[in-house]
Amino acid sequence: NELIDSVGILKPFWEKLRMLRLGIAVDTVRIVHVGDSHIRGHIFPETTGGLLQRTFGALSYTDMGINGAFCTTFTRPDRVADIAALHPDLVILSFGTNESHNRRYNSILHYRQMEELVCMLRKSLPDVPMLMTTPPGSYDSFRQRRRRRTYKINPRTSVAVQTIRRFADA
């Protein structure tokens, strides 16, 4: 895993965590993790949130995942309002798996959908940094003769990863 923050957007967040760790900060640091079934499954977010809480103490880690979600799933005003109501210090956006499973995946459309979601979140949370994650590797399944299934690496996942990285770097 690699965390890229070439312009230092996350510096204020890291400073809040540092102050929390030193016992100087009294406010709870709030992280909201938004995404698809990887987030909805709770295993990764609960493990991450628990580790962060044990390490830093007064930290709230809320996951908002929806099975089968795309970026556009969260562009509804009520969903953006739900995220904003949590008053996060950091928003983590984890999408791309479901987008890349579409055999007609369109990176331009995916980019625009990310742009729409981030613009909506920026209006409600103008000073909150956003961290974008990329999807894990996945497989496409194919039915062969005699109803046997075979699997091969989904080639669209790497395109989705490149699209997300390009968007995050813009």
Residue ranges and their predicted role:
Residues 28-119, 126, 139-141, 156:
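Conserved SGNH/GDSL esterase-like catalytic core that processes O-acyl groups on lipids
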Residues 23-24, 83, 123, 166:
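Structural motif
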Residues 138-170:
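Substrate-gating cap/lid alpha-helix
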Residues 126-127, 169:
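Short glycine/proline-enriched coil/turn segments at helix->beta-strand junctions
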Residues 129-131:
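Proline-centered loop/turn at the N-terminus of a beta-strand
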Residues 18, 119, 123, 162-166:
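Surface-exposed alpha-helical segments enriched in charged/polar residues
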Residues 1-33, 75-78:
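Membrane/wall-proximal cationic-aromatic binding patches
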Residues 94, 133-134:
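Alpha/beta-hydrolase-fold catalytic nucleophile elbow
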